[in-house]
Amino acid sequence: MNYNSLFDHTLLRADASVEEIKQLCDEAVKFNFFSVCVNPSYVPYVKEQLHNSSVKICTVVGFPLGQTSTKQKVYETKIAIKEGADEIDMVLNISEFKENCACVVNEIRKYKKVCKKKILKVIVETALLSENEIEKATLVVIDGGADFIKTSTGFSSRGASIKDIEIMKNVIEKNNSKLKIKASGGIKTLTFVEELIKAGAERIGSSKSVEIIKETLNKN
């Protein structure tokens, strides 16, 4: 299996340097990762670095808490796309989701309308949700018309778990949805990646992508 094309090679640290972002881009090209995932301020720079490659540019919106207004997230999304982003990883407003699911569905629809043919991933921060809430969040993301549901920001108490993915996949299958799953947060080994994919993940977000791919080379 070609694991390389499943990875969003990620660097979202607040203190990430230009040199580190350049290295991220170079690694993504070398290992043919699907995308690099960076904070919005680096999107123009990354666009320059990747202009002769097939590597996509992914950035985050409302990150990492999701506690900005819908208008702010829409504006962030418009700017990110204008500056070169191919994919938007938007953090769901968790407190709003817990209070009013219908309202959040409408928000996601607004973000997808702005994204048009660009990919929209909705981060639901599973560390803050019960299993029942993960099911509800998956339904919300399906109804909102997003392309992916994403487990985690990587900035909460935990990242992705196999159980998270299994719950999401079960809801997706029951509803005959085309929604895809991105697993992220704390993914550091090939074994864990294999388990996540088996459970239903179709994209992996990790800052350890290179180390994981080197594991596959050693395994072969």
Swiss-Prot record:
Family annotation (CDD domains): DeoC (cd00959)
Pathway this chain belongs to: Carbohydrate degradation; 2-deoxy-D-ribose 1-phosphate degradation; D-glyceraldehyde 3-phosphate and acetaldehyde from 2-deoxy-alpha-D-ribose 1-phosphate: step 2/2
Keyword Lyase attached: yes
Role of this protein: Catalyzes a reversible aldol reaction between acetaldehyde and D-glyceraldehyde 3-phosphate to generate 2-deoxy-D-ribose 5-phosphate.
GO cellular component: cytoplasm
Protein name, per record: Deoxyribose-phosphate aldolase
SMART domains: DeoC
Catalytically driven reaction(s): 2-deoxy-D-ribose 5-phosphate = D-glyceraldehyde 3-phosphate + acetaldehyde
Location relative to the cell: Cytoplasm
Protein's gene: deoC
Enzyme class, broadest EC rank: lyase
Record EC number: 4.1.2.4
